[in-house]
């Protein structure tokens, strides 16, 4: 019998801002099946009040694991919201709840970052802000993952780093993920 440590429940891609389904699915996974869930929480366009409401809800249903992300920038985004970077959201969650905060990392580099060195610097900000572990976003080359972990160690990023796994069902899915990550 498969007994995963957790099931990750995505928030949506492409700038989706409604996470009610995410929270309900995570609640069902934990309540009905007894499997820990990790909810994705993206900060794009959210205020501190919005996030506090979400944190209180998650605490109330016993969900302790949050993958804190900036999220995809939606078309027409006006720059609103209190969180410009994932590290800002991580810090806020850390200061306002008792959660296992997970940060995203990018072994092949974040698509918007101009260098892998700056990418590692940004990752260090996430850990310093309160991320207790990291999970990778899409990568294709295992050597990049191993090299990335070594660079993290050298940068004094000493939290667990897990390779994110997503079942691939078609080529279109791979191409879409490659443009988002």
Regions of interest found by a model, annotated:
Residues 5-9, 37-41, 66-68, 101-105, ...:
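Hydrophobic faces of well-ordered beta-strands that scaffold small-molecule active sites
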């Amino acid at each position: 019998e498969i007994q995963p440590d957790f099931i990750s429940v995505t928030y949506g891609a492409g700038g989706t801002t409604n996470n009610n389904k995410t929270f309900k699915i995570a609640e069902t996974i934990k309540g009905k099946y007894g499997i820990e869930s990790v909810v994705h929480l993206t900060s794009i366009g959210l205020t501190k009040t919005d996030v506090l409401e979400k944190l209180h809800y998650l605490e109330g249903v016993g969900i302790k694991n949050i993958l804190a992300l900036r999220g995809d920038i939606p078309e027409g985004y006006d720059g609103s919201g209190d969180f410009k970077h994932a590290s800002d959201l991580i810090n806020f969650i850390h200061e306002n709840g008792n959660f296992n905060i997970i940060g995203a990392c990018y072994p092949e580099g974040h698509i918007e970052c101009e260098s892998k060195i700056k990418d590692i610097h940004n990752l260090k900000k996430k850990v310093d802000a309160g991320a207790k572990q990291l999970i990778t976003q899409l990568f294709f080359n295992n050597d990049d993952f191993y090299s990335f972990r070594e660079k993290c160690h050298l940068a004094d990023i000493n939290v667990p780093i897990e390779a994110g796994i997503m079942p691939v069902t078609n080529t279109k899915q791979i191409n879409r993920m490659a443009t988002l990550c």
